[in-house]
């Protein structure tokens, strides 16, 4: 499928109608879903109605924005009024939100056409989209492999051309890791840049909504639309949003790029290292001043995250008890058995595991030893990044230690699965913007991602570095053969 700009030109020159573009996307979804399973719900009727509205605006001679008539997928942990929002969990299988999330509201106002709700790991807890209670999404480059997670459906849908762009959420790498494994661009904005109102919470101090696209430009256009202050989100930042399109300059002269030393070494696949090193050399050829930078506490990100995130999850998920909404167990003996049976039957294994870890870390005897200590280490990780950004504009490293693994390969070994987010987690702990973009393939033709990290609210720096690299290579033009 063409880029946002190309489709916009087709629309305003009447070469194609929004209805035709939407029908083409729905046809691709119809053909690929039996083997790909990117979507939990396909909203065809609503999509066609939105497309006709855009066509009516054009027929009336009205100007339309860049996203008008563009097919988009929405991760199924964002509330969509009147449309089921399941979070990939049995406990929310029949939940129909009575309100719209800020992000989906903004996209609808911009004329974007939602073609469906995408699959995810249950409550966004996972790195492979195998934890969904409903289906396992395949990787478009090899459907026997995982697309990454937790926003695997959103990444796979864009890679497979089922939609032009999509929306995901990122708590510890849930946008960037699937973007890397599916060979697309995924951006996690600065914490607070995009409203979380209507996003079903996993870990509130880490969650952030962001865009997926086939190109850096498409991701920038989508970010432009969803970023901005929202009084309904108390963590939303009251800042002026720059014009991100002005950052799309294919030149890195004078830019300082730091390579995080700690991300290379044990656990990193040889081919991934080779491809990423080659991409870093390319940045130098584009005029960037490349230097090694040490972030000594980077390696503590994973254990720190697996105390903080489950602790917040155990509190956030306490609300699912069968009383007000969602699944409720049949014929409980009393109130207590209604609570326990609803949660035992409604939550999947990984969600239960994280609730247990979090409850343990927050318990009176262990609070100081675990939760409080993790928060102190989080501050130290943040300080490492602050020090690094005193001497560089952008940091780079691999997005993931390996390429996409086989479905079922790591489900019995949670620790091995958790290591998939080794490179992405510290960025969330520090609240920084991070982007993954394709930088090559391994010997089996599986995509490899390069991660670029910026300072707080310096999405412009990240987008410029990513755009310059992308424009000097052909990786973004590759498509899976489905």
UniProtKB/Swiss-Prot annotation:
It comes from the Bacteria. Its EC number is 6.3.5.7. It catalyses: L-glutamyl-tRNA(Gln) + L-glutamine + ATP + H2O = L-glutaminyl-tRNA(Gln) + L-glutamate + ADP + phosphate + H(+). GO terms for cellular component: glutamyl-tRNA(Gln) amidotransferase complex. Keywords: ATP-binding, Ligase, Nucleotide-binding, Protein biosynthesis. It is an enzyme of class 6 (ligase). One of its GO terms (biological process) is translation. InterPro entries: Amidase (IPR000120), Amidase_CS (IPR020556), Amidase_dom (IPR023631), AS_sf (IPR036928), GatA (IPR004412). The keyword Signal does not apply. The active site is at 75 (charge relay system), 150 (charge relay system), 174 (acyl-ester intermediate). One of its GO terms (molecular function) is glutaminyl-tRNA synthase (glutamine-hydrolyzing) activity. Allows the formation of correctly charged Gln-tRNA(Gln) through the transamidation of misacylated Glu-tRNA(Gln) in organisms which lack glutaminyl-tRNA synthetase. The reaction takes place in the presence of glutamine and ATP through an activated gamma-phospho-Glu-tRNA(Gln). Belongs to the amidase family. GatA subfamily. Heterotrimer of A, B and C subunits. This is Glutamyl-tRNA(Gln) amidotransferase subunit A.
């Amino acid at each position: 499928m063409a880029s946002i700009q190309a489709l916009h030109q087709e629309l305003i020159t009447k070469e194609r109608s929004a209805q035709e573009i939407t029908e083409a996307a729905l046809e691709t979804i119809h053909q690929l879903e039996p083997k790909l399973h990117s979507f939990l719900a396909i909203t065809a009727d609503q999509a066609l109605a939105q497309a006709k509205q855009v066509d009516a605006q054009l027929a009336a001679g009205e100007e339309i924005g860049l996203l008008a008539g563009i097919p988009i997928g929405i991760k199924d942990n964002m509330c969509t009024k009147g449309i089921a929002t399941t979070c990939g969990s049995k406990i929310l299988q029949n939940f129909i939100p009575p309100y719209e999330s800020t992000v989906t509201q903004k996209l609808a106002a911009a004329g974007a056409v939602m073609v469906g709700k995408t699959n995810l790991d249950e409550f966004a807890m996972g790195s492979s989209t195998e934890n969904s209670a409903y289906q396992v999404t395949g990787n478009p480059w090899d459907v026997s492999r995982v697309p990454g997670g937790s926003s695997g459906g959103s990444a796979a849908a864009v890679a497979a051309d089922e939609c032009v762009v999509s929306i995901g959420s990122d708590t510890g790498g849930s946008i960037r890791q699937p973007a890397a494994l599916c060979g697309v661009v995924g951006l996690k904005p600065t914490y607070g840049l995009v409203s979380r109102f209507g996003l079903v919470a996993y870990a509130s101090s880490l969650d952030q909504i962001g865009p997926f696209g086939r190109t850096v430009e498409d991701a920038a256009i989508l970010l432009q639309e969803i970023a901005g202050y929202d009084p309904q989100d108390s963590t939303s930042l009251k800042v002026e949003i720059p014009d991100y399109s002005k950052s799309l300059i294919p030149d890195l002269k004078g830019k300082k790029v730091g390579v995080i030393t700690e991300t290379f070494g044990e656990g990193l696949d040889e081919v991934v290292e080779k491809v990423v090193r080659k991409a870093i050399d390319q940045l130098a050829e584009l005029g960037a001043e490349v230097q090694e930078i040490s972030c000594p506490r980077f390696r503590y990100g994973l254990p720190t995250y697996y105390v903080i995130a489950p602790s917040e999850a155990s509190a956030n998920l306490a609300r699912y008890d069968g009383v007000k909404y969602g699944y409720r167990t049949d014929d409980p003996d009393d109130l207590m058995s209604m609570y326990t049976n609803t949660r035992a039957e409604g939550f999947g294994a990984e969600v239960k595991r994280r609730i247990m870890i979090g409850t343990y870390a927050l318990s009176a005897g262990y609070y100081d030893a675990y939760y409080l200590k993790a928060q102190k280490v989080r501050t130290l990780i943040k300080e490492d990044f602050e020090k690094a950004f005193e001497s560089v504009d952008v940091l780079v490293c691999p997005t993931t230690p390996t390429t996409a693994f086989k479905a079922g390969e790591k489900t019995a070994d949670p620790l091995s699965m958790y290591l998939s987010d080794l490179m992405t987690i510290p960025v969330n702990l520090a609240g920084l913007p991070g982007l993954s973009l394709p930088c090559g393939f391994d010997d089996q033709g599986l995509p490899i991602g390069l991660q670029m990290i910026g300072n707080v609210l310096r999405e412009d720096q990240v987008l410029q570095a990513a755009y310059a690299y992308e424009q000097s290579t052909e990786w973004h033009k590759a498509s899976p053969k489905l």
